[in-house]
């Protein structure tokens, strides 16, 4: 058989879709997961409208091109990680494959990703789109958390390659804490945190709006996003951080310069407390969301405590970060410190309650950071889809035609170096 073309790896997220070919270290494209369509509410006879419908179906844009299209309606087919509008998703995939990857779908196997707790019906819909509309030869739907674990093997902190660990996946729209044992997600213990990149942007926007008058209102969101991505970091201690800024402001306060979209004049703002207060809402959610007050370190601890007792130690030892919102400087260090404090306090308490008769063995808490975090899921998919095993576990077009879309309800785990 001639050399196989590499598989296509597509990771669709709420905010951005990462796409590229297996075997590469980074995605060829990272585009916003949005689609601009013509919404025709024209009055006319049926035949005329049917003709228009056919034309309108081809008249759409995705990604960056879709964001500033004045006569189009911009839609985001994915919310909180889960696909909501399948018709739009099909059209989105069409341009992903033909316009961006420039691939002939009949020639490439595909690895797509799914969020935790995705329904089996959604997998069937995905299979129908890929096999019926695009006629792909093989499809594998991978769980994002497992791919993020595989991506963490690039970190120097990882000794053995294991698919057991706790994945903190924080993107633009949702943050999940997902325990994985031997490549299988422990579904009943997953917790989701209603704080993600978008909330940090909104919170930063609020802080800037209260203080900086010079930002043009229509640009306040993109300014907040740029400030967050460029200057934000996680601090070890809030009170000390405030006093650092108060005593030596010139050293810590940064300047951000933007251009007014209307008048084309430059505007300049000072970025102070916002730098550390933005990401702080992971550790003090009550700053931004009065309904949710549990810090991320407590959520991680609770998730692991809910898991079967024999996997708890490995889960503490391998806490893996994934997604753009975990990229803040010192995020991993602060999380490790906070989880360690919670765990040590519990061990100390059990020792005291036993009157000193029990000496619990200390628990090793390790948060793993690596340079692939931003697109860890995509990179994990790229690694696994370039192994020969991948082609053995893929669901093929032949299976699909014989059995139907239900074959994609289950995707076997592979890639554990056994």
Curated annotation (Swiss-Prot):
It comes from the Eukaryota. One of its GO terms (molecular function) is actin binding. GO terms for cellular component: Arp2/3 protein complex; cell projection; cytoplasm; nucleus; site of double-strand break. Coiled coil: none annotated. Keywords: Actin-binding, ATP-binding, Cell projection, Cytoplasm, Cytoskeleton, Nucleotide-binding, Nucleus. CDD domains: ASKHA_NBD_Arp3-like. One of its GO terms (biological process) is Arp2/3 complex-mediated actin nucleation. It is found in: Cytoplasm, Cytoskeleton; Cell projection; Nucleus. SMART domains: ACTIN. Its main location: cytoplasm. Belongs to the actin family. ARP3 subfamily. Component of the Arp2/3 complex composed of actr2/arp2, actr3/arp3, arpc1 (arpc1a or arpc1b), arpc2, arpc3, arpc4 and arpc5. ATP-binding component of the Arp2/3 complex, a multiprotein complex that mediates actin polymerization upon stimulation by nucleation-promoting factor (NPF). The Arp2/3 complex mediates the formation of branched actin networks in the cytoplasm, providing the force for cell motility. Seems to contact the pointed end of the daughter actin filament. In addition to its role in the cytoplasmic cytoskeleton, the Arp2/3 complex also promotes actin polymerization in the nucleus, thereby regulating gene transcription and repair of damaged DNA. This is Actin-related protein 3-B. It comes from Xenopus laevis (African clawed frog). The gene is actr3-b.
